[in-house]
């Protein structure tokens, strides 16, 4: 078992990494929260894979448990689904000293976090992420966003969980595409923060190799994320370094209407990382040869490095980013593998990174 502590004063918590964690999660939840009632919020498919195991573990620890299943879709990150969950909690009778558990990926994590922050004016919740992408990213840091009719990610808050429980073995049940999707996010962290993490991907020759070192990949990623959450809890300053590849990647996702079947978050981030690094190397901002190393790793993970979307369309989308202030933006780049930095660029300069 590995524990990584996030020091946020009264909102501090641990990330616990352990294979087979779900089997003794009940005792851990009981010890941490003292709750006698719990509601698991999960999604189609995950309920069958892990839901009943978690219910049994909680109930064996004396915790009365209800499981609420939401559709496995990006469209579930909505106020209508949140309202449905509120109703299910009221019907169940979850008290204010109960606990919510998010069992799933980013969508379930956002729904659960939002409900926890608002139900009974705030109750405890625990993140139990089941995808690599959520294990090393969205489940850590308390950032919660929902979509509304007017647009994506326009409603949200920061509300820290009481703990994040990660079982690396869950990755074995992921389709290959979604395993690689999460690995793309890990490569990103290696690029800007951890050379040795990046080198794990250079040395891996197969998915079996990756799965063997996955606990180490997750540990390194969570350590990085924990550090940046501590020094920049709301992601306004230093934590922006972790947006490496996201500026262009986010534009690609928006242009594709966040359709996972067209492009995943990890795939879009991979393209973003490659394009900014290629341009930065041409400008002398990044050590020569870095782009080719990144390209090798991305291709070994079957992640793309190019997009069919016209550069002018991407540039126009990026110019409208919420991170653009007075025509400028802090762009995350690499000096070399494992060493990232933020560079202020104008909207006009930013457009050149997608050409």
Task: Enumerate the predicted regions with their spans.
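ATP/NTP phosphate-donor binding region
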Residues: 1-98
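C-terminal charged capping/lid subdomain of soluble metabolic enzymes
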Residues: 2, 184-186, 286-355
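Solvent-exposed alpha-helices and their adjacent loops that cap or buttress functional pockets
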Residues: 7, 33, 93-95, 118-120, ...
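A glycine/threonine-rich phosphate-anchoring loop and its flanking beta-alpha core
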Residues: 16, 114-206
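Residue-level signal for inorganic ion chemistry
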Residues: 18, 40, 78, 129, ...
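Non-catalytic interfacial helical region
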Residues: 86-103, 112-127
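Short glycine/serine/threonine-rich phosphate/pyrophosphate-binding segments
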Residues: 107-114, 135, 251
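Active-site segments that bind and position negatively charged phosphate/pyrophosphate groups
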Residues: 199-312
């Amino acid at each position: 078992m590995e524990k990584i502590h996030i020091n946020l004063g009264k909102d501090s918590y641990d990330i616990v990494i352990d294979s087979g964690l779900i089997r003794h999660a009940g005792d851990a939840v009981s010890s941490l929260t003292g709750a006698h009632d719990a509601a698991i919020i999960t999604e189609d498919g995950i309920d069958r894979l892990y839901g009943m195991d978690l219910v049994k573990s909680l109930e064996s620890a004396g915790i009365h448990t209800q499981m609420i299943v939401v559709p496995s879709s990006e469209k579930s990150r909505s106020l209508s689904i949140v309202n449905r969950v509120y109703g299910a909690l009221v019907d169940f009778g979850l008290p204010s000293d109960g606990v919510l558990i998010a069992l799933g990926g980013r969508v379930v994590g956002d729904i659960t976090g939002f409900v926890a922050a608002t139900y009974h004016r705030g109750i405890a919740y625990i993140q139990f992420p089941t995808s690599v992408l959520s294990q090393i990213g969205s489940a850590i840091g308390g950032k919660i966003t929902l979509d509304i009719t007017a647009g994506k990610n326009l409603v949200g808050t920061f509300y820290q969980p009481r703990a994040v429980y990660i079982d690396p073995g869950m990755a074995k049940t992921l389709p290959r595409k979604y395993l690689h999707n999460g690995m793309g996010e890990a490569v990103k962290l290696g690029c800007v923060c951890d050379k040795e993490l990046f080198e794990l991907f250079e040395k891996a020759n197969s998915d079996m190799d990756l799965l063997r070192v996955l606990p180490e990949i997750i540990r390194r990623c969570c350590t990085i994320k924990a550090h940046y959450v501590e020094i920049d809890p709301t992601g306004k300053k230093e934590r922006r370094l972790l947006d490496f590849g996201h500026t262009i990647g986010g534009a690609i996702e928006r242009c594709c209407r966040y359709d996972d079947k067209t492009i995943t978050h990890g795939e879009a981030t991979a393209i973003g990382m490659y394009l900014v690094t290629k341009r930065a190397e041409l400008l002398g901002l990044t050590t020569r040869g870095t782009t080719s190393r990144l390209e090798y790793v991305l291709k070994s993970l079957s992640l793309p490095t190019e997009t069919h979307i016209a550069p002018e369309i991407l540039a126009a989308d990026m110019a409208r980013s919420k991170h653009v202030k007075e025509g400028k933006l802090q762009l995350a780049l690499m000096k070399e593998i494992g060493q990232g930095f933020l560079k202020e660029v104008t909207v006009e300069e930013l457009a050149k990174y997608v050409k």
